[in-house]
Structure formats: C-alpha cells, structure tokens
Curated annotation (Swiss-Prot):
Record note on cofactor: Binds 2 [4Fe-4S] clusters per subunit.
Species of the source: Jasminum nudiflorum
Keyword Iron-sulfur: yes
GO cellular component, one term: chloroplast thylakoid membrane
Protein name per UniProt: NAD(P)H-quinone oxidoreductase subunit I, chloroplastic
Predominant location: plastid
Length: 167
C-alpha cells in the first residue's frame, strides 16, 4: 500500500509541474498580446531603408574613367567594362559598362574603391523578375535614378505608422 501512496504523490507533483509550465507559457503569450504587429503589408507598406543600405548600384557614365578598379576589387569580377584606347590623347574612352544583379552579392566594394565616385548604392531593392536576363543592367539602366519610397504617395511607409515598442 505504501508504494501506491508514493506513486499518487509523484502523480500530483507531475501534475502541478505541468500546470506551472503551461502557466508560464501562457504568461509569455499574454505578454505579447498588447504589442503592435511587427509584420507589414508589403505591396502597400514598405520599410524605409537605413542610410547605409546597399541596394541597386547607380552608375554615372560621364564620371567613369574606365580604370577597372571596380572589376579588380569585386570578389566575383562582375562589372563588365568595355573601353577603347584613344591614341591621340592617350586616354581610355568608356564604351559600355554593365552589371548583372543576378550574380552581384551587393558587397559594395566597387562603390567604396571607385576613384571618381561614379558608382553609388541606392535604396532600390525590388529587383525581382521572371527572366534572369533582365537583371543584366547596362549603363543606361544603371544610370536611372530610383523613385524614393518616401516620395511615392501610393505607399504608406512604416515611419508614418505607430511606433513598435519592445515590451
């Protein structure tokens, strides 16, 4: 009869322990109930990117001297620089410049080491397409300035919504 009493006491202790664990989990759940949602409705709401966000690369054709520093510092030798040597003035003339964003890792080395600052990172991050060949941008596509998220009146930015507080 004595082992039956100890089993009943163990069963009671296990029941109390299980109820305590369930109560702790429920308290954590309730502590999150008064917080605002963290998710955003993407096509209609967008995050404002940070100041040093590394998005699509902007290229200024007139500033480029075809030195190919961007190609040398790129870990995957990505930028394609076509140039022609002008023999009368002994300088390179840039013919074509392109970057394939399907391969680019957005490390920012090309922007950082460019001696003429003809490359810069933009806040544009919507580069998805159905055809991977559309991600190969030439100097005309790279020269296009992106529309700022803040200036787009059709989109509500996250900074205009209530602040998310960490509980």
């Amino acid at each position: 009869m004595f082992p039956m009493v100890t089993e009943f006491m163990n069963y009671g202790q296990q029941t109390i322990r299980a109820a305590r664990y369930i109560g702790q989990g429920f308290m954590i759940t309730l502590s999150h109930a008064n917080r605002l949602p963290v998710t955003i409705q993407y096509p209609y709401e967008k995050l404002i990117t940070s100041e040093r966000f590394r998005g699509r690369i902007h290229f200024e054709f007139d500033k480029c001297i075809a030195c190919e520093v961007c190609v040398r510092v790129c870990p995957i030798d990505l930028p394609v620089v076509d140039w022609k040597l002008e023999t009368d003035i002994r300088k390179k003339r840039l013919l074509n410049y392109s970057i394939d964003f399907g391969i680019c890792i957005f490390c920012g080395n090309c922007v950082e080491y460019c001696p003429t600052n003809c490359l810069s990172m933009t806040e544009e991050y919507e580069l998805s397409t159905y055809n991977r060949h559309e991600l190969n941008y030439n100097q005309i596509a790279l020269g296009r300035l992106p529309v700022s998220i803040i200036d787009d009146y059709t989109i509500r930015t996250i900074s205009s919504s209530p602040q998310i507080k960490n509980g």
